[in-house]
Swiss-Prot record:
GO molecular function: structural constituent of ribosome
PROSITE patterns the record matches: RIBOSOMAL_S21 (PS01181)
Disulfide bond residue pairs: none
Keywords, comma-separated and alphabetical: Ribonucleoprotein, Ribosomal protein
GO cellular component, one term: ribosome
Basic residues bias locations: 43-59
Gene3D superfamilies in the record: Ribosomal protein S8 (1.20.5.1150)
Chain spans, region Disordered: 43-71
Keyword Ribonucleoprotein: yes
Name this polypeptide is given: Small ribosomal subunit protein bS21
Length: 71
């Protein structure tokens, strides 16, 4: 868990902002959301495979768009 030390003469809002930023960098909220409900290993693999396919399709579409001639 991210820990911050409140500096001297630092307002609460600034310290809270620093804490939120450190939580975001650590990926804490995403981890909590992922672990909120149990997900079967087969479902995890299926979701990851689908996201990989989507990523590849997106990259291929970008490359094809770059290689097409506009005239």
């Amino acid at each position: 868990m991210p820990v911050i030390k409140v500096r001297e003469n630092e307002s609460f809002d600034v310290a809270l902002r620093r804490f939120k930023r450190s939580c975001e960098k650590a990926g804490l909220l995403a981890e909590v959301r992922a672990r909120e409900f149990y997900e079967k290993p087969t479902t995890v693999r299926k979701r990851e495979k689908a996201s990989l396919a989507k990523r590849h399709a997106k990259r291929n579409a970008r490359e094809n768009a770059r290689n097409t001639r506009l005239y």
